[in-house]
UniProtKB/Swiss-Prot annotation:
GO cellular component, one term: plasma membrane
EC assignment: 3.4.16.4
The name this protein goes by in its record: Penicillin-binding protein 2A
Gene behind this protein: pbpA
Organism field: Bacillus subtilis (strain 168)
GO MF annotation: an example: peptidoglycan L,D-transpeptidase activity
One Pfam short name: Transpeptidase
Length: 716
């Protein structure tokens, strides 16, 4: 019996410990469930939205949309570059849209619109053929090749390349016109990036096409009807080469400018300025793109949008150009070129240039260049205004003002210097270096008036510290080349003018330093210069020695859809590049000589009767042909030039006229540059009087504002 007592005691102890364990278990369970409830509460209440987004895999992505590009006006507010609104149909693909889904949409769209198929490539056709004929495409691959993919000996891409390679011309010819329409549409849908609108059609979209697509948008996920724009030129081809161009919506960033624009934060499909003014002022004309935030669901479909920032249209440019003057000048050039081609010895003549600046501030009033060619028995003209800053020529005696001033400033000559104009015979040269006739004793003003070559030769010899002795060698200090070029550059000859356009060029600098070439340099027959350099040179003489930076943009204005003309954002100030290192009395002497050229010298026949009192210098340079007809390269010919400014006592315009390869035979010479110069200056003062009388600038501004108000009212 005693042996059983311990067992009873153990049983009682077990009965006592059981409730304790249960209590501990219940307590632990309570704590755990309480913790779970609290955690769930935190997840649902505090972090509910975050987890909801994660569960739905919502994503937010920012997309930019283009805004209207800035307009370009001339100095009198004539619109010369505007934007033309275009109907457009776009497609925005989601991140999860499949090839098959896009194909289905493309098929539906092909029943509603007609698109251009010219850009469809052979590769596009093959991709489409494989996509639309999966069974036939499968037959192009052997079971052995499929096994190689499974064995990872070749990739899926390798397999696809084999399919592409094995598609025959016969199979591609199966594609119908309908297929090509579908393919062209799908090709556009596949381009670009997800969530970024792509233009399916933005040229010649009819009102009917817009209406039909609009009615079926619910059947066309991602498709939208919207608008696009293209640059419009009210003055057609006038000044087009200087205005530049803009890339198309299909082109996006041009390949040659890709890195440049990407570094500035542009997207690859952005439309941008490609050349000249459109490129130079891209940052102003482009504007600020609108930014929209797309919210997508787990399938990548857009479920909502939110505007992050409103876009702002590009700034408008007001140019220094007078477009009415530009138009008149181009007509004058065309008329004179056409008349000249009827004369003998002009078979190489094919171009002419006129640049007009305001010497007081550097504003370019006109920059014209024309090329003439004969096609189908008639003359045709092409714009070549850019040639005024990208092509260079020997300018002849027009640069003699700079030669005289170099001689004066170096002390080689003085205001009272008189040289006998007579042929110079250097070494074994029996022809002699001479003027167009023996002029006898000439001072500075007479030398300019009668265009004495010999005066310039003797000035160059003095600058080069030489001594002329007939029929003997003429040793000169070759540093004289540097001296001349230094002073010439102060007027803008041989250096970039600084015009606000890209790709400006300077002329050719002769490399030989033989004495004879220094004499040629002094009369403008060695180094070459652009017509724009020549205009800056004469402008510097006209204003008393200040080299002004040529400007094409006068003002930058805000775009204002309601008022038409926005407020001035920036007014371009005149910029003095340098003051020539010469005494005022020296410049005045040359100015007096230029005035004599116009009144009784080599330009008197055309300019003496002008009421606006011009000053001028003519030029004829023995040159050689270097134009497009390569079979004639090197042919001896003559360039003719004119520089002028007016009025002589208070200049407001300065011009250069350059006609390369005017004639081959010197005996057939004529004054085409003088004639062009006279008519151009006449037209300037005629238009100025008319514009001042009629208040042209204010009238144009009022008209723009009236049109803007009418447009705004009709939109409302």
């Amino acid at each position: 019996m005693r042996r059983n007592k311990p067992k009873k005691q153990n049983h009682k102890e077990k009965k006592k410990s059981l409730p304790i364990r249960l209590n501990i278990l219940f307590l632990a369970a309570f704590v755990i469930f309480t913790w779970i409830i609290v955690e769930l509460g935190i997840k649902q209440i505090v972090q509910g939205d975050d987890y909801k987004n994660q569960a739905n895999k919502q994503e937010q992505s920012e997309v930019s949309s283009a805004v209207p590009r800035g307009k370009i006006y001339d100095r009198n507010f004539n619109a010369i570059v505007t934007n033309k609104a275009l109907n457009a149909i776009t497609y925005t693909r989601s991140k999860s849209t499949t090839q098959e889904q896009r194909l289905k949409i493309a098929k539906k769209l092909s029943d509603m619109i007609k698109v251009d198929t010219k850009k469809v490539t052979e590769r596009d056709k093959k991709d489409y053929w494989i996509l639309t004929r999966p069974k036939e495409a499968k037959k192009l691959i052997s079971s052995k090749e499929r096994q190689q993919v499974e064995d990872k000996k070749i990739s899926d891409d390798d397999l696809y390349q084999l399919q592409l390679k094995r598609i025959t011309d016969k199979q591609l010819n199966e594609l119908t016109d309908k297929d090509m329409q579908i393919l062209a549409i799908k090709r556009q849908m596949d381009s670009g990036y997800a969530l970024t609108p792509q233009y399916i059609k933005n040229e010649d979209v009819s009102a009917k096409e817009m209406a039909v697509v609009s009615e079926h948008l619910d059947e066309l996920p991602g498709v939208d009807v919207t608008s696009d724009w293209e640059r419009e030129y009210p003055y057609k081809n006038l000044l087009r080469s200087v205005l530049g161009s803009v890339s198309s919506s299909n082109e996006g960033l041009p390949s040659n400018l890709l890195d440049h624009y990407l570094s500035l934060g542009y997207s690859r499909n952005d439309r941008v300025g490609k050349s000249y003014l459109e490129y130079q002022y891209e940052s102003l004309l482009q504007g600020q793109k609108a930014k929209v935030e797309n919210i997508t669901d787990s399938k990548g479909n857009v479920t909502g949008t939110k505007t992050v920032s409103e876009g702002k249209a590009g700034k408008d440019l007001v140019l220094t150009i007078d477009i009415d003057l530009q138009k008149s000048v181009e007509k004058i050039i065309e008329k004179k070129l056409k008349a000249a081609k009827a004369r003998p010895s002009t078979e190489l003549l094919d171009r002419a240039f006129v640049v007009m600046m305001d010497p007081r501030n550097g504003e370019v009033l006109t920059m014209a260049g024309k090329q003439i060619k004969r096609e189908n028995g008639a003359y045709k003209f092409d714009d070549y205004a850019l040639g005024a800053m990208t092509s260079s020529y020997a300018m002849g005696s027009a640069v003699k003002g700079a030669t005289v001033l170099t001689g004066l400033q170096t002390g080689a000559i003085n205001l009272n210097t008189v040289f006998k104009d007579e042929p110079l015979y250097i070494g074994q040269d029996k022809r002699g270096k001479k003027s167009w006739q023996n002029l006898g004793p000439v001072g500075i003003q007479t030398a300019l008036e009668k265009s004495s070559n010999v005066f310039m030769f003797k000035t160059a010899i003095a600058v080069g510290k030489g001594e002329y002795k007939p029929h003997q060698a003429l040793p000169l200090d070759t540093s004289a080349f540097d001296t001349f070029r230094n002073y010439f550059s102060q007027f803008g000859l041989g250096v970039k003018t600084g015009i606000d356009l890209p790709n400006e060029m300077t002329g050719y600098k002769g490399t030989s330093r033989l004495s004879g070439f220094l004499l040629d340099f002094a009369i403008g027959q060695y180094d070459t210069y652009t017509p724009l350099e020549l205009a800056q040179y004469v402008s510097t003489i006209a204003n008393g020695g200040y080299r002004m930076k040529p400007q094409l943009v006068k003002e930058v204005r805000d775009s204002n859809a309601k008022k038409g003309i926005g407020a001035v954002v920036d007014s371009v100030q005149p910029e003095v590049l340098n003051k020539v290192d010469m005494k005022s009395s020296y410049i005045e002497e040359v100015q007096a000589g230029f005035r004599r050229v116009a009144t009784k010298g080599t330009a008197a026949g055309q300019l003496a009767s002008a009421s606006y009192k011009p000053a001028a210098k003519t030029g004829t340079a023995q040159s050689f042909y270097d134009g497009p007809d390569k079979s004639k390269t090197g042919t001896d010919t003559y360039n003719t030039t004119l520089v002028a400014y007016a009025p002589a006592d208070n200049p407001e315009i300065a011009i250069s006229v350059v006609v390369p390869w005017t004639y081959i035979d010197y005996n057939q010479r004529y004054s085409i540059t003088n004639e062009i110069g006279r008519e151009v200056m006449d037209k300037y003062f005629e238009l100025k009087s008319k514009q001042d009388k009629e208040g042209t600038q204010q009238k144009n501004k009022d008209k723009i504002e009236e049109n803007a108000e009418n447009t705004t009212s009709s939109d409302n």
